[in-house]
Design a protein with these regions (language model features):
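Ligand-binding pockets and gating/stacking loops
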Residues: 1-183
């Protein structure tokens, strides 16, 4: 692979956004913008980080750039628990979590009414709702123990050399099957 820049950080941005400089939407953000998500309980665009660390230029690689922040990626960690805090705290059982989120949304929407040009605030409001919805869909989507032993072997999960990469490939397949447009 080649790029217009010999500098790895700029080349990564070029690969992901088509531009050498940051501030432009990446391809996943464009897909999320143009196609949306098939499943409203899961994000439309997911990034899975390499277990050895994030890429050069970090989150600029999955940024929504000048588009509203709601189109940026949802990051999933590598390993056995790709999404933290999927289970609500014990003190928020029953309807209390929904009531808390509704109150928070009302405050945020009041705040947003005077700052409608702030897409980060709109994205924050949307992310709270998505996180709430993900509590029902995501645990099943990321539970690869439901796959047969043959499938786990085919993805290399039984070999320490390929287990981490295989886990991400299998997780990506499961997410796409459930409506995530871009991984």
């Amino acid at each position: 692979m080649t790029a217009d820049s010999p500098i790895h950080g700029s080349a990564m941005l070029m690969m992901n956004s088509g531009r050498v400089l940051s501030g432009h939407p990446c391809i996943g953000s464009w897909a999320n913008y143009g196609l949306g998500s098939v499943n409203e309980d899961l994000p439309g665009f997911v990034v899975m980080l390499d277990p050895r660390g994030g890429p050069i230029s970090g989150s600029k690689n999955w940024s929504s750039g000048y588009m509203p922040a709601t189109y940026q990626a949802t990051v999933m960690r590598s390993g056995r628990n790709p999404i933290l805090d999927l289970t609500p705290p014990s003190e928020l059982q029953g309807n209390s979590q929904r009531q808390l989120l509704d109150t928070l949304r009302n405050y945020n929407e009041d705040h947003f009414a005077t700052r409608s040009d702030n897409s980060n605030l709109a994205a924050r409001i949307a992310s709270y709702e998505l996180a709430y919805k993900m509590q029902t869909q995501a645990p099943e989507a990321v539970d690869i123990s439901q796959e047969t032993q043959a499938t786990q072997e085919a993805y290399g999960l039984t070999d320490p050399k390929s287990e981490k990469f295989g886990r991400q490939c299998l997780l990506a397949r499961r997410l796409v099957e459930r409506g995530v447009r871009f991984v």
